[in-house]
Amino acid sequence: MLIKYRAEKVIIGSMAFENNRINKGFLEKLKKEIGRGKIIIAIDSKKGRIVTKGWRENTGIRTERAINELEHYCSEFLFTSVEKEGLMKGTDLNMLKKLKKLTKNKINAAGGISSLEEIKQLEKLGVNSVLGMALYTGKLKIKDLRKIAKF
């Protein structure tokens, strides 16, 4: 439905998981309806496990396993390091390095990114940065981001 109204991509979070398992039936149906290229799956990770429903429920699914099993349902992942979200103390670079080796899909990283240096490190890994608190608080400025942006 959203694609019909010209949404370019759809982000699927908790719906990708059901009863502490990957919701393959839902994802397969969605992929058939709108195409893999329009789907981004949110990977909210806390202590190496997928969390859902506003980060309140731990599925027990290892983050690396989720990436492996979900890769063919989507074209991108939105990875959030829940422990780092909003703290502006850096994201989970080690986990992102592992995940990047597991998938050819695009990875967008959120949670804790707070410096131009970190954005450059993520870029070298082939990971996009999603910024929130660092922009909101003024720790990162748009004018500085423009200097390193490639668009």
Where are these regions (language model features)?
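Gly/Ser/Thr-rich helix-start
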Residues: S14, L87, G112-I113, M133
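Catalytic cores of alpha/beta
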Residues: M1-K9, N94-S129, L145
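Alpha-helix-loop-beta-strand connector modules within alpha/beta enzyme cores
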Residues: K24-I43, M88-S115
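Active-site environment of divalent metal-dependent phosphoester hydrolases
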Residues: E85, S114-E117, T137
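C-terminal helical cap(s) of enzyme catalytic domains, especially alpha/beta-barrels
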Residues: R21-I34, K100, E123-F151
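Conserved anion-binding
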Residues: I3-E85
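Short, well-ordered secondary-structure micro-motifs
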Residues: I22-N23, V51-G54, M88-T91, I119-K120, ...
